[in-house]
Regions:
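Glycine- and acidic/polar-rich repeat regions and solenoidal domains
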Residues: 1-184
Length: 185
C-alpha cells in the first residue's frame, strides 16, 4: 500500500494499524482498564473482543478505535476500575477516534467518560460514537458524557446516532453475546 510516505522499497514512516481482536479480556480486581492506549499511542484498534469489568481507554494520541466489542460492567464501584466506563478518555484531544458498534452493560447508567469533552465543540473533544447498544438496569438512568446531562442531550450533539438503550438481559444472555464475539458470530 502506498500512503504517500513510502520510500523506493515500499516502506513507510506511517505506522500500520495494530488491531487487538477476538480476545477475552477479564479485568482483575486491581486492574483499571481493559485496554489502555496511552501516552501518544496511535493506530490502535480494539475490535471484536469480549471485555469483563473493563472497557477501552485512551490518553493522548490519535487514530484509535473501539469497535464491535461486548463490554460488561466496566466502572463497577468498589473495584479499582470504579468510574471508568465503556470508553474512557482522559485528555479531550481527538483525531480520528471512534467508539462504534459496541454492546455495553453498566451497573449505573454511566456509559462514557470523556473528561475533556466540551459540548460546544463535541466533535473535536470527544470520540465519535454511533450504532452502539447500551444495557442499563431498570433502576438506572442513562447519563450522557460531556456535561450534556441526559441521553437525549448527548444525541442532540450528534453523538451516538443509531445507538439504542435497552434493559439489561440475563447474565446468560450477556455471556452468550460475548462468547459469540470471540468465537465467531
Amino acid at each position: 500500500m502506498n500512503d504517500g510516505f513510502n520510500d523506493d522499497k515500499g516502506r513507510s514512516v506511517i505506522k500500520a494499524n495494530d488491531t487487538q481482536t477476538g480476545n477475552l479480556i477479564i479485568n482483575g480486581y486491581n486492574g483499571v482498564w481493559g485496554t489502555d492506549h496511552d501516552d501518544g499511542s496511535q493506530f490502535q484498534n480494539d475490535a471484536g473482543n469480549f471485555f469483563i469489568f473493563g472497557g477501552c481507554k485512551n490518553y493522548l494520541g490519535n487514530h484509535k478505535q473501539c469497535v464491535d466489542n461486548v463490554i460488561l460492567y466496566p466502572g463497577t464501584s468498589g473495584r479499582s476500575a470504579g468510574g471508568h466506563r465503556c470508553q474512557t478518555d482522559d485528555n479531550g484531544v481527538f483525531a480520528e477516534q471512534f467508539y462504534v458498534g459496541n454492546t455495553c452493560a453498566t451497573e449505573d447508567g454511566r456509559i462514557l467518560d470523556f473528561s475533556g469533552c466540551n459540548p460546544t465543540n463535541v466533535n473535536t473533544t470527544a470520540y465519535r460514537t454511533a450504532m452502539n447498544t447500551y444495557f442499563v438496569d431498570s433502576s438506572s438512568t442513562l447519563q450522557g458524557p460531556c456535561e450534556s446531562g441526559t441521553w437525549a442531550e448527548w444525541q442532540a450533539l450528534g453523538q451516538d446516532i443509531g445507538s439504542i438503550v435497552a434493559l439489561t438481559p440475563s447474565v446468560a444472555t450477556l455471556i452468550s453475546l460475548g462468547a459469540a464475539k470471540v468465537l465467531g458470530d
